[in-house]
Structure formats: C-alpha cells, structure tokens
Curated annotation (Swiss-Prot):
Protein role: Aerial growth, conidiation, and dispersal of filamentous fungi in the environment rely upon a capability of their secreting small amphipathic proteins called hydrophobins (HPBs) with low sequence identity. Class I can self-assemble into an outermost layer of rodlet bundles on aerial cell surfaces, conferring cellular hydrophobicity that supports fungal growth, development and dispersal; whereas Class II form highly ordered films at water-air interfaces through intermolecular interactions but contribute nothing to the rodlet structure.
Similarity section: Belongs to the fungal hydrophobin family.
Keyword terms: Cell wall, Disulfide bond, Glycoprotein, Secreted, Signal
KW Secreted (keyword) present: yes
Protein name: Class I hydrophobin 1
Subcellular location per the Swiss-Prot or TrEMBL entry: Secreted; Secreted, Cell wall
Reported consequences of knocking out the gene: Impairs the formation of primordia. Inhibits the mycelial growth on various nitrogen sources. Affects the resistance to heat, oxidative, and osmotic stresses.
Disulfide bonds: C65-C126, C72-C120, C73-C106, C127-C140
C-alpha cells in the first residue's frame, strides 16, 4: 500500500511540472531569452550589502578645471621629452619635474561653445601654468570633453 502511494505521488508530481522551453529554443524561434530564475529565494549577505556609489558625477558639460583653464594643445608630452626640454631650456624655464605633462601651442577652449564649431582636434587638457602665452603650458592633465 505504501508503495502505491509513493508511485501515485511521483506520477502526480511529474504531471504537475510544466515543461519550460530553454533559451536556445526561444532564440531559435526569434524570441528574446528569458531572464535568469532566482533559485535561492532568501537574500545572501552580498545581496544585502549596500552598493558602492560613484565618487563623483560629471557636471553635464560645464567642465571646470581646478588647476587652470581648459586648453587645446597641439602636442602634450612629459617634460623629459627631448623637444619639450629643449624648448623649456630656450625659454629659461627650469625646475620642472621630468614626469610633469607640458603642452605646446595651446589655445584656450570654451567647453560651453563646443557645439558651435569651437572644437579641439588635438588634445584637450587642463594646465595650471599658462604664463607663456600658449606656447608652453606646464602641469597639464588630459581631459575628455
């Protein structure tokens, strides 16, 4: 008798299980794949942990350089580059560390006016020392506009 109840339970369970098509079968018919099923219903510690927040958010086009103005430079290299070091020497600029980025032939760039034809085809940077009229800008940081 116990055996017949066990068989009846197995048959009833098998009959109540619905066949779910695989994602491969759905994609073969041109349908989107199903999202993954959550097999474990209780949350784990990683699910309960608070997600990290970004350290900063870009400010919708009003890019502000903390070190100086936005410049568009024809060339940006480290101060130990042979061309850059020669130009710095000719201008009498000394004491620049070898790993500092230096921009050559820089012109001011208005980030607000980028949509109206004011664009930088070379390399946009923020430079802290633009005292040589755009010929040499020292302490540059590359930026993405």
């Amino acid at each position: 008798m116990k055996f017949s109840y066990a068989i009846a339970a197995v048959v009833a369970a098998a009959a109540s299980v619905q066949a779910v098509e695989t994602n491969g079968q759905r994609m073969a018919r041109g349908l989107k794949p199903l999202p993954p099923r959550n097999i474990h219903r209780r949350a784990s510690r990683t699910n309960e942990a608070r997600g990290a927040t970004p350290s900063g958010t870009p400010s919708g086009g009003d890019y502000n350089c903390n070190t100086g103005s936005v410049q568009c430079c024809n060339q940006v290299s480290k101060a130990n580059d042979t061309v850059i070091s020669a130009i710095l020497g000719l201008l009498g600029i000394g004491g620049v560390a070898d790993d500092v980025l230096v921009g050559l032939k820089c012109s001011p760039l208005s980030v607000v006016g980028l949509g109206s034809g004011n664009s930088c085809s070379q390399r946009p940077v923020c430079c802290e020392n633009n005292s040589k009229g755009g010929l040499v800008s020292i302490g540059c940081i590359p930026i993405t506009l």
